[in-house]
């Protein structure tokens, strides 16, 4: 268990237009070193993003992993394939058996079990904050800036500074 709370990507539904650019950017960021540009004509595998945009007539909002410190998905995994590494909950895709226990345990609906192709086993996919990359692809690509990385420690510092700055002068 980590002492520092995990950061996670948060969405502002009022800004999201449902364009799904975040889904494509996520897929691209996790396409294991593909160098050529990905277009409709050259993608051979299913697009499996680790963020999902829910859209209806009234709103659209991306849903992604909240990087829970005491993660229900990790606690439910019978083989411990979901672990915390450097304050990020990650799936060991080589160990995952595709049992879907994590899917049922996630209160946010942010984990999914799929296969890249019919000849490959089904495994769990979830946001890993683009682990090993400089920035989160979904945050970087969002045209309306509806997504941002939420760091609980930085947010607490920001709110503390705001509170001190807004103290009455007689204090």
Model-derived regions: residue spans:
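Mid-length scaffold segments of soluble, non-membrane domains
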Residues: 83-91
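N-terminal signal-anchor transmembrane alpha helix
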Residues: 17, 21-28
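Short, flexible micro-motifs
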Residues: 21, 83, 112
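Residues that cap or initiate secondary-structure elements
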Residues: 15-17, 133
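Flanking helices and flexible, charged tails adjoining ferredoxin-like Fe-S electron-transfer domains
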Residues: 1-6, 32-75, 93-171
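Short amphipathic
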Residues: 10-12
């Amino acid at each position: 268990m980590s002492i520092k709370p995990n950061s996670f990507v948060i969405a502002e539904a009022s800004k999201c237009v449902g364009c799904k650019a975040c889904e494509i950017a996520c897929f691209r960021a996790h396409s294991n070193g593909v160098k050529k540009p990905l277009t409709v004509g050259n993608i051979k595998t299913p697009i499996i993003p680790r963020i999902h945009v829910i859209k209806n007539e009234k709103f659209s909002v991306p849903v992604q992993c909240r990087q829970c410190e005491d993660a229900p998905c990790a606690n439910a995994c019978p083989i411990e394939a979901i672990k915390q590494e450097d304050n990020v909950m990650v799936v060991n895709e080589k160990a995952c058996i595709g049992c879907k226990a994590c899917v049922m345990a996630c209160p946010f609906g942010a984990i999914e079990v799929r296969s890249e192709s019919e000849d490959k086993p089904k495994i769990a996919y979830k946001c890993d904050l683009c682990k090993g990359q400089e920035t989160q692809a979904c945050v970087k690509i969002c045209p309306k800036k509806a997504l941002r990385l939420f760091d609980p420690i930085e947010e607490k510092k920001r709110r503390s500074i705001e509170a001190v700055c807004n103290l009455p002068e007689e204090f």
